[in-house]
Amino acid sequence: MKKVCALALSILTTIGATAADSAWAAQTSVHLYNWYDFIAPETPKAFQKETGTRVVLDTFDSAETAQGKLMVGRSGYDVVVITSNILPGLIKAGVLQELDRDRLPHWKNLDADILGKLQANDPGNRYAVPYLWGTTGIAYDVDKVRKLLGPDAPVDSWDLVFKEENISRLSQCGVATLDSSTELVSIALNYLGLPHNSQNPEDYQKAQELLLKVRPYIRYFDSSRVDTDLSNGNVCVVVGWQGTAYMAQVNNEQAGNGRHIAYSIPREGSLVWAENMVLLKDAPHPQQGYALIDYLLRPEVIARTSNYVGYPNGNQAALPLVERKLRENPAVYLSKETMATLFPLETLPLKVERIRTRVWSRVKTGS
């Protein structure tokens, strides 16, 4: 009888160990959903080397795409990098897991001012961890723009792309823009002297008229290839993020093609935005998710990503590790005067979001 019990115990122990091993094997990956080309390439491999956990990376090129996928649920992702204005909707829908800061020892490195601003969309900083932040402006090929518009080209103004006499001439060398209703419609409203977060349908009609007037001169709407096309000369003006210009500059340096790419935040004002790491409530691997978020909070780790993509981060301890050419670039680490001209992305009522989406659809199709 003892032999039978011993045998049974041995079998059960073996089964238990096998089950535990299988469970651990299933837990040795973490799924990250991030913007296209928005993390230093060596970071996932470095994390795996240190922890044994493989990072499975999926990417998106618009906040609207990511939001739609997350709202459906069961995405299979653990950690997602998401724009601040989308946070309230995800929190309300119960998509996100409230963070246990005891599992994030490197939280202490975060900038208190950045955390304070984030509370507008995440009260108490309960769900989101600052990752990178940036602006939307105009990236352009200095020589090509001057050749077409002269030395006094209004590169410090939205007039460059919203006045037909300018954009019609620039279309000869190519004008492209982000594919983002949230950003472009808000910028158009602000340019017209209207509230960027307007809830008045008539204001959106005016923004639509402005955008449709310049639509024939826009070559394409795409958020993922504008930096490459700017650096190789396929386009000369891009309404895009500051990192668009930075990546184009890096590509030019590597290619040695002599192109001079610059970035401008128009004097009329533009968007400032923040990207944040969140842990999904239905994350398949929450333990590994916490480990990845905390790893990305290390100063040396997030500094590598800033140096790669050209965006500032919300990690105060990382600032000395950010390359000098970024730290001292006034288009990256902004002056108080420039910051005062910027406005944030905001969550709007669903009926207004639908109006904005319809406007953008009409602009893209030119109808």
Swiss-Prot record:
The keyword Transport applies. One of its GO terms (cellular component) is extracellular space. Keywords: Periplasm, Signal, Transport. InterPro entries: SBP, Sperm_putr-bd. It is found in: Periplasm. The keyword Transmembrane helix does not apply. Residues 1-19 form the signal peptide. Binds putrescine and agmatine. Belongs to the bacterial solute-binding protein 1 family. This is Putrescine/agmatine-binding protein. It comes from Pseudomonas aeruginosa (strain ATCC 15692 / DSM 22644 / CIP 104116 / JCM 14847 / LMG 12228 / 1C / PRS 101 / PAO1).
